[in-house]
From Swiss-Prot:
Subcellular location: Nucleus
Protein name (database record): Class E basic helix-loop-helix protein 22
Xref: InterPro entries: bHLH_dom, bHLH_transcription_factors, HLH_DNA-bd_sf
Main location: nucleus
Keywords: Nucleus, Repressor, Transcription, Transcription regulation
Function recorded in the entry: May act as a transcriptional repressor.
Segments for region (Disordered): 26-70
One Pfam family here: HLH
Domain bHLH: 153-207
SMART domains: HLH
MF terms in GO: protein dimerization activity
Organism: Xenopus tropicalis (Western clawed frog)
Gene Ontology terms: cellular component: nucleus
């Protein structure tokens, strides 16, 4: 009797277990049109990853809704889609960690030791892919090193050229300060670059203005020397001019200037030489004329 009761309890246990397994299988079965099999992108250590609490919560909610009816089935499909997205993202991060560990030559230990050998094939394929990636990336790394070295050399050359240019500019400005007045006096501190250039500009403009005034004066003197000495204005002015010329011959250059204001002739004979000018006036002694006294 007890044995029959035990068999009945065992049959009931197995039946309930199989029913639970079927319900779990139906809950985890992907809907139509959704393919979760991605052997190329899955992590080789996906069998060691622990379940995500959020995924378990979603599965529990989905199982509860599946038992309630068709509305629960629709929620299960949405939950499975979200779970698939989370699992893909998690597997992508795991694959990235594994590729980094394999490229660095280290070995990543699994926290669990109860593996049943289902990931061996995936591990081998991932190892082959990692080795192929290392072989392909090796020339790229060499080329990147050469490129960075060339860029560093180019940057150093540009910096050296700019440094030489600044040194030449500073030397030129120092030479300019040395020749400009008021730029190197003890009471004035060292001028800046802009102040030096402005002072040089003003100094050049001042020199140009002075040169222009000098040219006008020379032209005026040349024009006065071309006028004939016959245009002496009046006897008094002629006497004063003759006396001035007798005292100093260089003052004869200013005689035509007076004639410009008085263009009328006085009727006096033209005197071209110093003795003739001295002979025109009897009241002026010829001994005062330097040219007459210097002649033998």
């Amino acid at each position: 009797m007890e044995r029959a009761l035990n068999l009945a309890e065992e049959d009931l246990f197995h039946k309930s277990l199989s029913a639970s397994a079927k319900r779990m299988e139906s809950a985890f079965r992907p809907p139509q049109g959704l393919d979760l099999s991605q052997p190329g992108d899955r992590s080789p250590l996906h069998c060691y990853d622990g379940p995500d609490p959020s995924d378990l919560l979603r599965h529990h909610q989905h199982h509860h809704q599946a038992s309630s009816g068709a509305l629960g089935a629709a929620g299960a499909n949405e939950a499975l889609a979200l779970a698939a997205a989370n699992m893909c993202a998690k597997f992508g991060e795991s694959a990235g960690r594994v590729s980094v560990a394999e490229s660095s030559g280290g070995e990543e230990q699994s926290p669990d030791d109860d593996s049943d050998g289902r990931c061996e094939l995936v591990l081998r394929s991932a190892e082959h892919r990692a080795q192929a990636g290392l072989k392909v990336d090796a020339p790229c790394a060499t080329g990147g090193g050469k490129k960075s070295k060339e860029q560093r050399t180019l940057r150093l050359n540009i910096n050296a050229r700019e440094r030489r240019r600044m040194h030449d500019l500073n030397d030129a400005l120092d030479e300019l300060r040395a020749v400009i007045p008021y730029a190197h006096s003890p009471s004035v501190r060292k001028l800046s670059k802009i102040a030096t250039l402005l002072l040089a500009k003003n100094y050049i403009l001042m020199q140009a203005q002075a040169l222009e005034e000098m040219r006008r004066l020379v032209a005026y003197l040349n024009q006065g020397q071309a006028i004939s000495a016959a245009s002496i204005p009046n006897p008094a002015a002629a006497a004063a001019a003759a006396a001035a010329v007798a005292l100093h011959p260089a003052l004869g250059a200013y005689e035509p200037a007076a004639a410009v204001g008085y263009p009328f002739s006085t009727g006096l004979p033209t005197a071209t030489s110093c003795p003739d000018k001295c002979a025109l006036f009897n009241n002026i002694s010829s001994s005062l004329c330097k040219q007459c006294t210097d002649k033998p």
